[in-house]
Amino acid sequence: MVGGIERYYQIARCFRDEDLRADRQPEFTQIDMEMSFVTEDDVMAMNEGLVKRVFREVLGVDVETPFRRMPYSEAMARYGSDKPDTRFGLELQDVTDVLRESGFAVFKSAVEAGGSVRLINAKGLAGALTRKEIDKLVDVAKTYGAKGLAYTRLTADGVTSSFEKFLSEEEKAALHKAAGAETGDVLLVVADAKNSTVFAALGALRLAVANKCGLIDPDKFNFLWVTDFPFFEYSEEEGRWMAMHHPFTMPRAEDLDKVESDPGSVRALAYDMVLNGCELGGGSIRINDPAVQDRMLKALGFSEERARESFGFLMDAYQYGAPPHGGMAFGFDRMVMLMLKRDSIRDVIAFPKVQNAGEPMSGCPETVEEKLSLIHISEPTRPY
């Protein structure tokens, strides 16, 4: 952009050192675009048009545009995920205020520590969610960091609960009212001192229940934009603030005065396109002001020397007048996987990689010739 190229579009092969998942491969194809003099709305509109045309011409499916937009905070509060599957309900409900003074120590201690108590009301699913099935859901919750899973089943035979015996009659009534609980419902409750744990556990439980009970329509294509991601996230491991996406995303102008005083509340001009619970693509408006970039790097703990050493070329480029610019990239393989309604990205890649990033069919990565050592490429150890 600084060099005078107003915009570009590329299909790029990428390799990332990331964990293998059903929708992720270490080597993949990316559809990437960057444009000068655009706003968030411009980027979204262009990519909605691209997706609409692809789905119409390839699948004969008419995708409705513009896509729904949802702030990150709303996505987490309602779905427990920053890439929510909106083809079904089972939305999260915050019952922290109802149970703030609860006699149940698990709830009370979580709230006192600054956390929350939230639940999913699996309406009409008491028949499907037996005690045995709920035990399986406990394991799901623990996998995502929760210490356990509290539940209440309301059936024609009465109410069975793992925790309501610790509540007063008033608290029980208030909880049932807040949750909209009726006969046939199951309340799945998670409490923790960390809201991130509550969201992760309930988000996973929501998907597990939907898959178990057949609540997902496989023929639906539900698109939405998740916007206003936090610029910073705090790393307990490193004891410092880190960039949630990358340090070159432009923060919202109205949040700039909070960068030093309240970094956790700073929102980024970042956006993800989500389809049926999968991130289809993502992007952002980039920083083009050297003063703003300097502030963000300092807030991330970069000394002036380290910032210069790591990003000096970028800071120098800014001095020549970088235009406002932004863009977005799609995962091409993932898009094909979702369009074909496949559960694994391996189904749409000719030679997918295995867990250690090797490819058994061709035996790659292969050994290299000795002469490559002259350009500092060493001979690797075969992964298998």
PLM feature segments, named:
Residues 1-36, 71-131, 138-142, 150-151, ...:
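Class II aminoacyl-tRNA synthetase-like tRNA-binding/catalytic domains
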Residues 1-2, 84, 141-148, 228-231, ...:
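Conserved phosphate/anionic-ligand binding catalytic regions in large, soluble enzymes, centered on
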Residues 25, 29-32, 38-56, 185:
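A conserved active-site cap/scaffold subdomain adjacent to cofactor or substrate pockets
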Residues 64-79, 91-98, 153-160, 220-231, ...:
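A glycine-rich phosphate-binding loop feature that marks nucleotide/adenosyl-phosphate handling sites
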Residues 184-186, 192-193, 197-257:
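Catalytic nucleotidyl-transfer cores of nucleotide-processing enzymes
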Residues 254-325:
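Generic long, charged, amphipathic alpha-helical segments
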Residues 273, 306-319, 328-330, 338-365:
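Substrate-binding beta-hairpin/strand module that engages nucleic acids
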Residues 375-384:
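Single conserved hydrophobic/aromatic residue that forms the stacking wall/gate
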